[in-house]
Amino acid sequence: MDTEYEQVNKPWNELYKETTLGNKLTVNVGMEDQEVPLLPSNFLTKVRVGLSGGYITMRRIRIKIIPLVSRKAGVSGKLYLRDISDTTGRKLHCTESLDLGREIRLTMQHLDFSVSTRSDVPIVFGFEELVSPFLEGRELFSISVRWQFGLSKNCYSLPQSKWKVMYQEDALKVLKPSKKKASKTDSSV
């Protein structure tokens, strides 16, 4: 693994300054580019790393979201990146709410997180506050991810995968008005 990229041998505080320079996502929706600010991450209070050497940065992270439902369906949610190297599963980044009924391309130059060169990459991504009129099991969109490490020119990627509504509560977030109507009819019966 050490041959795939060059190590960044800098003190952690220097590396932190370097990686936080690009903490915005460029969102490409159709023909327009918009910048979506990332909510601040509070990882410095919990991260356990040595003060120097052996850590690299994930960079040029590109996430493409292709909808599998109509734009009129009103599917939206916040994309997050989470560190799963410990049991807390602390959140590294979270976007504002995105309209997931259109194709979206997210590009981030740096991720405010550095991983040890001797470990697997302990980062996962997903969605929260997902609003969807569909019941669980419905495929909403597919996602592909590409990234680079440190100073390497090599690109890494995850194969395109389809995302489904995982929990009934997600679907119920937009069905609350309908639920009130249903409860009135139930009480009148």
UniProtKB/Swiss-Prot annotation:
Database matches in InterPro entries: TBSV_p22 (IPR005332)
Record-level Gene Ontology MF annotations: RNA binding
UniProt keyword list: Host membrane, Host-virus interaction, Membrane, Phosphoprotein, RNA-binding, Transport, Viral movement protein
Subunit: Interacts with host protein HFI22.
Record's subcellular location: Host membrane
Disulfide linkage: none
Pfam family, one: TBSV_P22
Keyword Transport: yes
Function text: Transports viral genome to neighboring plant cells directly through plasmosdesmata, without any budding. The movement protein allows efficient cell to cell propagation, by bypassing the host cell wall barrier.
Any Gene Ontology biological process: transport of virus in host, cell to cell
Keyword Mitochondrion applies: no
Family affiliation: Belongs to the tombusvirus/aureusvirus movement protein p22 family.
Name by which UniProt lists this protein: Movement protein
The record's account of how the chain is modified after translation: Phosphorylated.
Domain of life: Viruses
GO cellular component terms attached to this protein's record: host cell membrane; membrane; viral capsid
